[in-house]
């Protein structure tokens, strides 16, 4: 077929509970399949313990991220984990509040970022929640796909001395933008402010350099 994956998915998607009939081709034989559409949930947090090290992988930041991460962190402590790897590779970001909650596993109501317009600080965001991993040795993995909220967390944990960053330079998304709709249907994206790490570094267009450079796969 000349259809792209996105085109196929668009055809299959539909209202939850309804059925879709598919014809599959296997070894030149056609197979009719009927499936019932359902909501697909992809958790933003996955965790495992390998050789006594707790590995927390966060794929994006949304409303459930901080809650899921805290639940997994509590399991780490119950299991006696004393070292944690926070994997933010390929995480494009998401909600700042989720970044505050994730950082709150290590930070105790401390600044995770400031937003500035020119030289004026217009907003300060702090970590939320109890820092149950505050004394746990932590490594944060980043790469060129780690952006926005991922960079907020990575930058904050390093600036506060809670983690060592390992991997490759991050994406470099350190601005807050607004979209202005123009006549004729066009849009103009305007940078409203820039955000800075707790130590006052803006990474927009520059990214965060890891403490230990390693090409990660």
Predicted features along the sequence, with ranges:
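Short, intrinsically disordered/low-complexity patches at protein termini
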Residues: 120-121, 137, 189-190, 213-214
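Conserved functional hotspot residues or short segments at active or partner-binding sites
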Residues: 203-209, 213-217
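Short, acidic, Ser/Thr-enriched surface-loop or helix-capping motifs
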Residues: 197
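Well-ordered beta-strand positions in beta-sheet-rich domains
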Residues: 32-34, 187, 211
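Short hydrophobic-aromatic micro-motifs
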Residues: 56, 188-190, 203
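Short acidic, Pro/Gly- and aromatic-enriched capping/linker segments at domain boundaries
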Residues: 182-194, 209
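Cleft-lining beta-strand/loop regions that shape enzyme active-site pockets
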Residues: 1, 5-183
């Amino acid at each position: 077929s000349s259809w792209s994956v996105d085109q196929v998915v668009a055809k299959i998607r539909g209202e939850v509970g309804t059925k879709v009939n598919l014809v599959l081709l296997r070894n030149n034989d056609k197979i009719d399949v009927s499936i019932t559409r359902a909501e697909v949930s992809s958790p933003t947090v996955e965790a495992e313990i390998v050789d006594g090290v707790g590995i927390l992988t966060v794929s994006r930041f949304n409303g459930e991220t901080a809650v899921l991460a805290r639940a997994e962190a509590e399991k780490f402590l119950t299991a006696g984990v004393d070292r944690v790897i926070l994997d933010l590779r390929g995480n494009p970001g998401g909600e700042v509040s989720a970044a505050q909650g994730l950082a709150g596993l290590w930070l105790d109501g401390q600044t995770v970022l400031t937003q500035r317009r020119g030289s004026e600080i217009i907003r300060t965001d702090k970590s939320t929640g109890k820092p149950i991993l505050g004394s746990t040795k932590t490594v944060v993995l980043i790469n060129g796909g780690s952006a926005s909220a991922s960079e907020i967390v990575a930058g904050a944990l390093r600036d506060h001395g809670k983690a060592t960053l390992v991997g490759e330079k991050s994406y470099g998304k350190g601005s807050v933008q607004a979209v202005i709709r123009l006549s004729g249907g066009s849009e103009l994206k305007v940078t409203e402010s820039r955000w800075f790490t707790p130590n006052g570094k803006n990474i927009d267009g520059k990214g965060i350099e890891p403490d230990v450079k390693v090409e990660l796969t």
